[in-house]
Curated annotation (Swiss-Prot):
Binds to 23S rRNA. Forms part of two intersubunit bridges in the 70S ribosome. Disulfide bonds: none annotated. GO terms for cellular component: cytosolic large ribosomal subunit. Part of the 50S ribosomal subunit. Forms a cluster with proteins L3 and L19. In the 70S ribosome, L14 and L19 interact and together make contacts with the 16S rRNA in bridges B5 and B8. Pfam families: Ribosomal_L14. Belongs to the universal ribosomal protein uL14 family. GO terms for molecular function: large ribosomal subunit rRNA binding; structural constituent of ribosome. InterPro entries: Ribosomal_uL14, Ribosomal_uL14_bac-type, Ribosomal_uL14_CS, Ribosomal_uL14_sf. Keywords: Ribonucleoprotein, Ribosomal protein, RNA-binding, rRNA-binding. This is Large ribosomal subunit protein uL14. One of its GO terms (biological process) is translation. It comes from Pseudothermotoga lettingae (strain ATCC BAA-301 / DSM 14385 / NBRC 107922 / TMO).
Length: 122
């Protein structure tokens, strides 16, 4: 359950480490984002000497949330942190690696490149 001003960890090697959500995409009054949603973020913490600058506005896909996500079979999945993967204007990941597990809902939303880079899909 990600909303405006939420902080996210970055789960890829794009160069950013922390993001702050500016807006959850997908509708005029959409308040909360969950796994698979696109968010517009400001970069708050970066790795030195990378292509990403602090304060840069980027788009990202949420891949993990602490809030449990209910699946159609009645099971729930939750993670230890809130994390996202940075994407470009073609919805492809900006990094070349993804760290940590990602939820299966990412595949259903059509982010196959992120699924192929992830070490584990839960």
């Amino acid at each position: 359950m990600i909303q405006n001003e939420s902080y996210l960890n970055v789960a890829d090697n794009s160069g950013a480490k922390k993001l702050r959500v500016i807006r959850v995409m997908g509708g005029f009054h959409k308040k909360y984002g969950t796994v698979g949603d696109i968010v517009v973020c400001s970069v708050r913490d970066v790795v030195p000497n990378t292509g990403i600058k602090k304060g840069e506005v980027v788009k990202a896909v949420i891949v993990r949330t602490k809030k449990p996500v209910r699946r159609p079979d009645g099971t729930y999945i939750r993670f230890d942190d809130n994390a996202a993967v940075l994407i470009d204007k073609f919805n492809e990941p900006r990094g070349t690696r993804v760290f940590g597990p990602v939820a299966r809902e990412i595949r259903e939303k059509g982010y196959m490149k992120i699924i192929s880079l992830a070490p584990e899909v839960l």
